[in-house]
Structure formats: C-alpha cells, structure tokens
C-alpha cells in the first residue's frame, strides 16, 4: 500500500475489529451510511487494490439503508454467521478454521498486550487479530519501538491470519445471503493481503 498512512491502516483494522466483534447498534448503522464514512471509503479507494472491495461494501450498505428493520436483520445475519454452529456459518475463530488457537496468545504476549475482560470471546477471535494489527500499525507511526521489531510481529500476525482468513471470507460469501458481512470480509481479506505484501 502506498497512499494510506500507518495510522489510517490502524484505523481500518480497529473499525473492522469492532464490526466483527458484535452486532451493529443503531448509532453504528447510521454511521456506516453517513457522509463521513463516504469520505473515508473514498480515501480507501485511493488504494487501487482496495477499490473493488470498498465498492462492494458501499453497495451492500446502500442496499442496507432501504432494508426494513435493517438493524434487526443485520443482527440476525451476525448471529447466524458468527454465533451458530459451523455447518452453515463462518465462525470467526482460528480454532474453528483448524488453526493453532495459541498462536494469537503468543503474539499478544510478544506485543505486550492481553485480551480485555470486557470482550467475552476466546482469544483466537478475528477481532483480537485485528486489534493487534491496529495496535502494531499505530506503534509504527509513533516511533517509540524499533520499526523492525514491530514489522516482524506484524508479519507474524498477518501470516497467522492468512492461514484461515480466506476460508472464513469464503464462508461469509457462501452463507451471508444479504451480503454485508460477505463484503466486509472481502475488504478485510484484500486489506490483509495488501498489508502482507508490503514487507
């Protein structure tokens, strides 16, 4: 990625972590369809590899704004995709995708972080990976920790995530009939791939 700063990438990861961690409330639903978000999406589209994924997300948001009981419908989509059994879902855990659930714990320790008691999900939840990546990108911008150390940890985190994120995104596309979370997971997949390529 060339046009986005480390802080902007950190913000994208933090935003995605929030959206994948819990159902959207009314305020978040209003925010994602706001003019401010449209400006943010325009900035993201300035990064060519992200353009198609952001367009897909914007289309799903436009459809969402005319959907009756949008918040309730999205809540049902969230529960069906992320909280049910894995037979027709896209469970957001490394362990559900046959990956080492301890890897994220090791990465968090290496980064000097731990999971919050307010987040009642296992440590291998997708949102934890995204929060870690957000933290690492913010740290790159601060310059207090050697960039080489942060970059090494970022690469380890991206490598671990890339082992199961494509399957997760494919399951979102397969089982999210409305398409909001499918579009969100596609944006995440492209972002992670771009971030990984930026060694």
From Swiss-Prot:
Any one GO CC term of the record: cytoplasm
Biological processes annotated in GO: protein complex oligomerization; protein folding
Places the protein is found: Cytoplasm
Family: Belongs to the TorD/DmsD family. TorD subfamily.
PANTHER family named among the record's database cross-references: CHAPERONE PROTEIN TORD, CHAPERONE PROTEIN YCDY
NCBIfam families the UniProt entry points to: PRK04976.1 (NF003442)
UniProt cross-references to HAMAP family, sorted A to Z: TorD
Biological role: Involved in the biogenesis of TorA. Acts on TorA before the insertion of the molybdenum cofactor and, as a result, probably favors a conformation of the apoenzyme that is competent for acquiring the cofactor.
Protein name: Chaperone protein TorD
Organism name: Escherichia coli O127:H6 (strain E2348/69 / EPEC)
